[in-house]
Amino acid sequence: MMATAQSLEDQTLLAFAQLMEGGQEDDETCRELDALTKLLNDDYNASQANPQHQSICRVIDGDCVDTVLGYLDMRQPDAVRAHATLATSAYLKAAGQDGSKKLSAFFFDRVRRGTYDDYIVAFCVASAIFPVVPELSATLFLSEGFLGSLGPLMRREWKSRKVETACLEMLNTACMNPLCRDAVQKYCVDWLEEVVDQHPQGSGAASDAEPKVQGEGGSISMRRHSEQVQHLAAVILAKLRAVPSKPPHDGQPRPRVEPAVTSIQDLSAIFTKMILRDQDHGTQHSVEGLAYASLQPSVKESIIADTRLLHKLVKTLTLAPPRSPTTYGALSIFLNLTRYRPRLTDEETKMNQLKAYANATDGLPYLDPLDDDEHVCVRCQAVFDAGLVPVLVTHSKNGSPASLSLIVSIIHALAVTKSLRAPLAQQGAVKLLLAAWAMIPSTDEPSRRMAAQALARILISTNPALVFGGNRPTPINAAIRPLGSIVAPHATAETRDLLPTFEALMALTNLASLDDEETRRSIIKLCWPDVEEQVMSSNQLVAKAAVELVCNLVQAPEGVALYADATPQASTRIHILLALADADDTGIRSAAGGALASLTGYEPVLRSIVQRDRGVDIILGLCSDPDQGLRHRGVVALYNMVAADGEAGNLARDKVKRQGGVDVLKDCLKQSHNPDVVQTAAEALKALLAEQTS
């Protein structure tokens, strides 16, 4: 065991020695970093499994840490930096507290030295580790005096723009942390404004002046900053504008209007100008900035109004590599453009009104009319017309879970518009949603439910036969499990939203309407308990949709068996159907009547109806209903009962006659104009009168 530990330590030191040598090809460097990453990950796993394990981190000193962190320098190739980030992450996980101490010492030592190279490496390291160890990174970032020193630093003349760029990259990454974002707002916003506000080439005086020596002070507005630096500063300002800081804790009210040199609209214009260029340089930062700026309704409207920009954003997403920052940023823009306000229940609406009255001194909460449903609907149409959906389909095949979640959210919003549902299906949205539902981790329940609901919306408004089957590789049964997953309301949601339930039931009803017993059989197998529960829903629309689905399901033998197997459960189900056939809502009565019309041809169902006190009365009530459709369902059910053979038929005919069925059928014949109703009622009456004369 000791020999193995010694061997691992030797391998670790050898890996660091080769990394320290330098001068290697990038591929060799990446391989060495990967080898180190594996050693560290294995070491961490061994420590977790055995507390007595001697970690290889004990041979990793400050020089070793400096070596790995040096490969995070922005002047290194992107591939090397990516592999170095993985190695750094593995080291910090394996080394624990000691690793955090060494990293902190490295950062503060480099900042204290204050040379050109030291600043670049320190800022690059801070940027790289923020997503890896956010708490440690925030501690470094918020250390006393650090942020305050950045203003004077940006006023110095350097031999290149890399110090400025590295500094702004660090600030940009740090804005993911609320405390760091507030600190940037407090200490850096003034000079960030100056950087953004100046002309890229600076003023005439600055252009003609001799370059200042390193360390000389002066106004930032008199420095000449590159476009890249300006755009980075603009992205940071966009994040500060889009995500408001927390109110002060000292009890002092925040000013209603905070002074700002550069508005969010100005920043949006900067990003738009950069994106519309034919150059790729700066696109990533501009897309990221516009993603934050487009949280504002006015910016959303300006993007939609600029057809050229909208198409360029679609093209940018088309060309962006999978899992890249540009892909995520572009998807975020389209999500912001298409996102509807959350649906509020009546209770939530009343609660918000009460809160508004309680806080009347601060003014009522403002809901921008540019973000109402009408404006969002127009934006969704514009985004669809720009050709976004095929690009989303392509990106969904190779995207990260985070990107896939954004794609699903966009399709979900587009599917709100009924006129877009069939085109969405034609452009591949159904296959996208089915794949997404299967790929999204079960831990991301909101995204999975959103994918299922978007699928339901599309399948409500399209002919399933045109979406599935034939030469299409996707079988219709692939949609049943996702739809079934949202029939039951979300168990852990704070509010009870029945819209997904309703839409799923409608979509399943559409699938069950096909002449395909296998589809009905699958729905019963996968969804029946939840469907049956919704039959008794207190929401009339949900109950109606559930009973309509039942009406289609009982066309299959498995559906009939649920009501006609002569068990107590089946009898209870018939009792519920009879009660629904007597409901106040016409739609519920119609769906229940349709199910009874199909089921009354089976003896156990017939007996169950006859044995109920009001069973026959309810069927006769359907025959007397003013609605011709309901009347037709009633006379079909009644005919099945009185035309039945054997003892069950005799019982049915006897009770129907005793309940005044002959007169009901005569009145039905007089008042009906539908030939099907007249013919069926006449046959039922004939069956009753034939027995009476025999």
Regions found by a protein language model. Name each.
Residues 3-11, 35-38, 54-77, 83-118, ...:
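Alpha-solenoid helical repeat scaffolds
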Residues 11-262, 272:
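Long amphipathic alpha-helical scaffold regions
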Residues 15-19, 67-72, 103-111, 149-154, ...:
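Buried hydrophobic core positions in alpha-solenoid tandem helical repeats
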Residues 25, 76-77, 114-115, 157-160, ...:
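Short inter-helical turns and helix N-cap capping residues of alpha-solenoid HEAT/ARM repeat scaffolds
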Residues 50, 54-63, 97-105, 139-145, ...:
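Short sequence/structural elements of tandem HEAT/ARM alpha-solenoid repeats
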Residues 331-391:
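Acidic, serine/threonine- and proline-enriched intrinsically disordered linkers and terminal tails
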